C-alpha cells in the first residue's frame, strides 16, 4: 500500500473522455440542446436541426481545437501549454475509442440534420461546412499543425 502517494493523472485532460459515463453525458447534452431549440416556437424543424449541428460543432471546435493547456495547475504544464485538448487526449495516441467517438458523433449529427432538412441546399451547405470545419482538425495529419499560424501561441 502506497500511503501518501497521489494516484491521479499528471494531466487530467489526457483521460477525461475515458471517464465512466462521459459518452452518455455527451449524448444527453446534445439531446438537451436539441430539445431546448425545439421549444423555441418560431424555429422550424429544419432550422432546429441545422442549429443543433452548428452549435454542437462550434462548441466542439472551441473546446477541443482552440483552447490550449490545462485548466489545472499540473506538473507537465510546460509541455501541455502549447497543445490543444484534442492533442492532449489519450496521450496523443491516434484512433483510440474516445477519438473515434468524438469523430463519429459530428458525422451522425450531420446525417440526422441532412435527413431532417430534406437535403435543402442552404441547410446542406451550412451543415457540410460546419462538419468539415470540425472534422478536418481531428485528422492525424493535422496533429500539432497550426494552419496559417492561427492559434500558434
From Swiss-Prot:
GO biological process: ceramide metabolic process; intracellular sphingolipid homeostasis; negative regulation of ceramide biosynthetic process; sphingolipid biosynthetic process
Cytoplasmic side: 1-21, 64-105
Compartments reported by the entry: Endoplasmic reticulum membrane
Annotated InterPro entries: ORMDL
Membrane topology note: Multi-pass membrane protein
Tissue: Widely expressed. Expressed in adult and fetal heart, brain, lung, liver, skeletal muscle and kidney. Expressed in adult pancreas and placenta and in fetal spleen abd thymus.
Topological domains, Extracellular: 127-153
Keywords: Endoplasmic reticulum, Membrane, Transmembrane, Transmembrane helix
Keyword Transmembrane found: yes
Annotated transmembrane regions: 22-42, 43-63, 106-126
Record Pfam families: ORMDL
Gene Ontology CC: one annotated term: serine palmitoyltransferase complex
Entry text on domains: Ceramides bind to ORMDL3 N-terminus and stabilize it in a conformation that physically restricts the accessibility of the substrates to their binding sites in the serine palmitoyltransferase (SPT) complex, hence inhibiting SPT catalytic activity. In the absence of ceramides, the N-terminus is flexible and permits substrate binding, thus liberating SPT from inhibition.
PANTHER family (alphabetical): ORMDL PROTEINS (PTHR12665)
Entry similarity comment: Belongs to the ORM family.
Function: Plays an essential role in the homeostatic regulation of sphingolipid de novo biosynthesis by modulating the activity of the serine palmitoyltransferase (SPT) in response to ceramide levels. When complexed to SPT, the binding of ceramides to its N-terminus stabilizes a conformation that block SPT substrate entry, hence preventing SPT catalytic activity. Through this mechanism, maintains ceramide levels at sufficient concentrations for the production of complex sphingolipids, but which prevents the accumulation of ceramides to levels that trigger apoptosis.
UniProt-recorded name of the protein: ORM1-like protein 2
GN (gene name): ORMDL2
